[in-house]
Amino acid sequence: MSPKGSLWYKNAIFYEVYVRAFYDSNGDGHGDLAGLIQKLDYLQNLGVDCIWLLPIYPSPLRDDGYDIADYYNVLPTYGDINDFKELVRQAHARGMRVITDLVMNHTSDQHPWFQAARSSRTSPYRDYYVWSDTDQKYKEARIIFLDTEKSNWAWDEIAGQYYWHRFYASQPDLNYDNPAVQEEMKKIIRFWMDMGIDGFRADAVPYLFEREGTDCENLPETHAYLKEVRAFLDQHYPDAILLGEANQWPEDVLPYFGNGDELHMNFHFPLMPRLYMALKKEEKTPLEWVFERTPAIPENCQWCTFLRNHDELTLEMVTPEEREFMWREYAPDPKMRLNLGIRRRLAPLVDNDQRRIRLLYSMLFSFPGTPIIYYGDEIGMGDNIELFDRNGVRTPMQWDASPSAGFSAAPPSRWYAPVISTPPFDPQRVNVADQIRRSDSLYHFLKHLIALRKAHPELASGETRWIDTGSPSVVAVWRAESDRWLFAIHNLADKVQEINLTLPVVTGELTDVIEGRLTFNSKDSRLKVQPYQTVWFSNNVK
């Protein structure tokens, strides 16, 4: 691992793991921490630097663990605290870090705090949540899950009051106006940091506080508390990071970086749909537009970028017309849609076209930001739109070609979810073992791309310039730091593009560092780019 005090997260490769889906070590049909430990060598060989764990806490699993019933323990089907400590130890021994989800905004309604709170108005936990005698407060706050929730308030018969929830009614919001809640969250942070983890992905951070007359998002009180948490981390765990989930426009996310004293990293949500939009339209305008709206951030901060994750491909930050376009092109079946988004994985979104998958990865790795890979997307796994809600993109990892995909020795009736069984995404066609054997596989392409990114630190923190190509279908980016530079070209079209380039420097003949075939003489501005081709030229070739 990089040394303490370094900005390690700026040049890291993050890998998102849903423990339940990864590998079942004890034959109960559920992935577990011991199973993940057995697969750490696989992640190390791929080139992963940091593992992000979805929630591992005890939970009724109405929202796949984001409804926490105990912040100080591990879901029994995943293992126990000792298993978690061993995971962290083994990951660190392989040079990989571990961060876990910190669900700050809400708990499960099964949490003992909420059960005590609803039982009596004099309970010390009553003020851990937001209660009201009316459901008319905070009317300007939007409803996030419009598919299932009609209000942000839910009536509790036992409490005799309404409680506030920004997500599902089974997830009551914590009351951060209560100093005891603020201190409790710091205790939780200390508990897990003392086990050696390297930070947290802070879930749903814009919604911590409520104020009448506002939309109850991005409030000054929220930023003040997050800065307090950051100062606490910096004092006690200076190498740890906070990665924020703020599904907002880049200019609204900017304050979450503070002056480099709030969150270390934030997801860049609006980029994800525009990568797919640009690809389908075969034009770079959506990408140019979103990067023009992306402000500069403090030097010690970083954006996190991604092609897909465990949720739907969110279309909250597109116009209604763009949303209809995305649904029409990428989710023609209503089962593929969820809330304001698309519940599909990377490979099915692009019809399993390996050229387009590789192009998307190349853009992700050459554009500004730290990339995150969602488990299974490194081999092009499929989805199951027949499963409920977001479960369709959370199916078992496919390790081999067996009917169980090598995920579990349990009978299929005990699996937490079925393995993808229909071509072209069934285990016989998509699995880790096969792709490791084949040098031309998506796995090996991505492994090569990861190695290239690490060999080119200018991609992590260097200057970014967008180069005119003379073609609306070809996006080109120049990344430079000190005397090192890398120039990446991406053809979004399904036809050959002849482009004209004027580079910031003239160096003579260059060779593509991805495949080593295409050459370009920078003294000659003309270049022919094949359909969906991606090329990287660099003066830093090892």
Language model regions located:
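Active-site and adjacent substrate-binding regions of carbohydrate-active enzymes
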Residues: 1-542
